[in-house]
């Protein structure tokens, strides 16, 4: 692999954090490489640091996409939530359901860590395009402000202010640190209570001021506005469970590097749930139902289903029933 192509993974990491969309991140990186290969060999050789050039171009493309994305969201049906990432065991290793993932798929290019938790991405989405790009370049990817200024097209001082403003937004929204085991336990208990249609148990797990946000994109049924309050959410969740089809299943999965849930019908992912936990309660639930945002999950569930179908059924020698 050439040194230029070796930058692809890092660029996808960068673009996903900037855009909150795997598909848009892939488009941005493809456009970046298209511009590189549109240059002559002499022009390419004249560039002292190809990696820096690629980063600058990709960041500016993302900056432009963020501006147009805001305009598109004015006509978006319902709430907009960033695209969820499948669990690292399926994607970060390049394996999907035990098979090699398509190397062109951006989902297996993203490093799963705290900086792309759903709560973090949602706060990023509240920033201006310039704030978001400056913050990600400096605070997440550790670029010096002099380089950030060159990329964003503003002064060093202006970029410091942008990053500082973004940092205040992050700190204002951050919940106190939660141990991974506690987070996983809360999500698991929520699943059990939801499966049991136990309203009281659900209320006990939810913050009284909790919020449930759904993104259907106008393509599937979804609440158009956030549902507020622990008791309302509990009753809403139980109402959904009572209407759930017999071919449905609720599964524990890792979503953006943290414990989450996935709803499937006939083995196909139809909703991905991400959670924010604070002070021993669930503070926010994001439910992504827009099928355009679930493509990596549907690929994964298809591979899981195929792997299951490929397994031989147990023969008589595996039976545990005593027929004597």
Language model: regions and residue ranges:
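Exposed beta-sheet edge and beta->alpha loop/turn motif
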Residues: 258-282, 286-289
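N-terminal regulatory/sensing modules of transcriptional regulators
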Residues: 190-196, 201, 281, 313-314, ...
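Active-site-adjacent scaffolding segments
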Residues: 2-192, 198-201, 205
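Short acidic-hydrophobic surface loop/beta-edge motif
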Residues: 252-253, 263
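Short loop/turn motifs at secondary-structure junctions and domain boundaries
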Residues: 193, 243, 263-267
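Low-complexity, intrinsically disordered terminal/linker segments enriched in charged
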Residues: 288-324
């Amino acid at each position: 692999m050439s040194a230029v192509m070796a930058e692809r993974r890092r660029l996808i990491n960068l673009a996903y954090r900037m855009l909150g969309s795997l598909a848009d991140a892939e488009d941005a990186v493809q456009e970046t490489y298209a511009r590189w290969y549109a240059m002559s060999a002499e022009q390419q050789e004249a560039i002292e640091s190809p990696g820096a050039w690629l980063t600058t171009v990709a960041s500016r493309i993302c900056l432009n996409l963020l501006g147009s994305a805001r305009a598109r969201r004015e006509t978006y049906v319902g709430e907009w939530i960033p695209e969820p990432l499948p669990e690292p065991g399926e994607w970060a290793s390049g394996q999907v359901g035990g098979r090699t993932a398509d190397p062109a798929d951006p989902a297996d290019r993203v490093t799963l860590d705290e900086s792309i938790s759903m709560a973090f991405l949602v706060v990023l989405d509240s920033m201006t395009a310039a704030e978001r790009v400056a913050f990600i370049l400096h605070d997440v990817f550790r670029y010096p402000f002099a380089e950030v200024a060159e990329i964003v097209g503003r002064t060093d001082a202006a970029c410091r202010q942008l990053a500082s403003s973004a940092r205040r937004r992050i700190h204002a929204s951050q919940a106190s640190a939660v141990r991974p085991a506690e987070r996983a336990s809360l999500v698991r208990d929520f699943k059990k209570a939801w499966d049991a249609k136990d309203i009281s148990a659900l209320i006990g797990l939810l913050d009284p001021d909790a919020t449930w946000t759904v993104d259907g994109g106008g393509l599937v049924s979804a609440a158009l506005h956030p549902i507020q309050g622990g008791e309302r959410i509990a009753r809403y969740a139980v109402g959904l469970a009572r209407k759930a089809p017999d071919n449905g299943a609720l599964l524990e999965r890792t979503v953006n590097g943290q414990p989450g849930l996935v709803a499937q019908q006939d083995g196909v992912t139809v909703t991905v749930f991400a959670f924010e936990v604070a002070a021993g309660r669930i503070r926010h639930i994001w439910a992504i139902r827009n099928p355009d945002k679930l493509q990596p999950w549907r690929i994964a569930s298809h591979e899981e289903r195929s792997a299951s179908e490929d397994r031989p059924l147990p023969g008589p020698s595996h039976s545990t029933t005593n027929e004597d």
